[in-house]
Amino acid sequence: MAEKKKGGRWGIAHIYSSYNNTIITITDITGAEIIARVSGGMIVKADRDEGNPYTAMQAALRAAAIAKEKGIDGVHIKVRAPGGNKHTTPGPGAQAAIRALARAGLKIGRIEDVTPIPHDGTRPPGGKRGRRV
């Protein structure tokens, strides 16, 4: 008797990417249970290399391997930059991490940007006249 193929298990890949680091967390679809968590610092020794695209790619491959081992077939991606009164653009590792997750064999669902945006929050660093160089 032939087995019926299931739709597969989906998760959410939270990619936090700044200029100093990239953190990839894969959770279940509710976001409550963490399945895999890998950061740039777990891949390389030098602090200056944590935010590199290559490091993000290796971190994504490692996270994808752990997720596939635990039965995740596809992921929805949430990309986050530091946000607030810091940079609102993701770091160099975000694009590399998304590409690596796709190459690792995970199906990609939605990709959305969840960077926090201030609604007139705190004053940005640099004071009244800004940073004078």
Curated annotation (Swiss-Prot):
GO MF annotation: an example: rRNA binding
Keywords: Ribonucleoprotein, Ribosomal protein, RNA-binding, rRNA-binding
Transmembrane segments: none
Sequence segments annotated as region (Disordered): 114-133
GO cellular component, one term: ribosome
Cited SUPFAM superfamilies: Translational machinery components (SSF53137)
NCBIfam families in the record: arch_S11P (TIGR03628), PRK09607.1 (NF007176)
Family membership noted in the UniProt record: Belongs to the universal ribosomal protein uS11 family.
Subunit record text: Part of the 30S ribosomal subunit.
Physiological role: Located on the platform of the 30S subunit.
Protein name: Small ribosomal subunit protein uS11
Protein species of origin: Archaeoglobus fulgidus (strain ATCC 49558 / DSM 4304 / JCM 9628 / NBRC 100126 / VC-16)
